Amino acid sequence: MAQITVVGGINIDIEGSPFEKLKYHDSNPGRIHLAFGGVGRNIAENAARLGGDVAMVSVIGDDQMGQAARKELEGLGVDVSCVRTLRGRNSAMYLSILDDRRDMELAFCDMDIIEAITPVFLKEHREFIAGSRIIALDGNLTEELLCCAVEMFNGTPIFFDPVSGAKALKAKSCLGGFESIKPNILEAEILTGITIDGEDDVRRAADRLLEKGVKRVFITLNKDGVYYTDGGSEGFLRPVDSLKIVSATGAGDSFSAAILMGTVWGKTVEETARMGMAAASIAMESSCAVNREMNIQELLRRLT
């Protein structure tokens, strides 16, 4: 058993970018980059790099890339005993084609395999998961699975990452079962029905989530930082002006990992939010979804 168990997706991300202007209906010389991704997987990797005792619950196909993704997590110290290989299936994949300015022209996603993480699958690992200090749920999971997890593990704190506005909708019926949640502004609007135009609206949306039963709320505000509250302590944290941003791609997943670590360490909601901001600042200094330089020493240094 691990202190932190992440239930979610493991993806293979493939990105192609041309050396020159993209030519349609033709073969374009360029670079093809392959990386392991998935919200759940990225959260697990970040938490492991921060020194967390982490387990991953997921599914992969019986292809080489899926097995390599599993092996990489294992090499980081993540318990992958609950990552199941499905025979005859492809691992989840995301293929993006960029133009010469590195803007996305086209993308394909083949992620149906995540639907194999079913309530039955969860029940098979019930004892293992229930022994965690906190469980993280990836918003890519099905609505049935989210609600089942809330009911099945009601004695264990659950963290939910909505992932996107459309996917946040799946959690509306079981919001009260989450100990903590990290929506962005759009996701908070969808979950609460409150239009957010300023700080007062952010507070109102967070209060609505607390009313629904969530214990700790972290609403991320893009370049403006984060708002945190647990009903007793609340506040806004802003990014430092000296922040060096290479890419914001991995900021959200690293923030989520820091919330998990803060929970395990018994940190206050403010301390946890500060950990999230520090982790996000590290993540944004890399072009990768997970910064290889993510570590607990650097996070603690940025908290001082």
Which residue ranges define each predicted feature?
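Conserved phosphate-binding/catalytic region of the ribokinase-like
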Residues: 1-5, 167-168, 172, 199-304
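Glycine-rich phosphate/adenosyl-contacting loop at the front of the ribokinase-like
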Residues: 1-78, 244
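Alpha-helix C-terminal capping segments
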Residues: 45-53, 98, 262-266
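Short, conserved phosphate/pyrophosphate- and ester-handling motifs at nucleotide-, phospho-/glycolipid
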Residues: 47, 184, 252
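A glycine-rich helix N-cap at a beta->alpha junction
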Residues: 75-88
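Conserved beta-alpha-beta core of the PfkB/ribokinase-like small-molecule kinase fold
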Residues: 134-204, 224-226
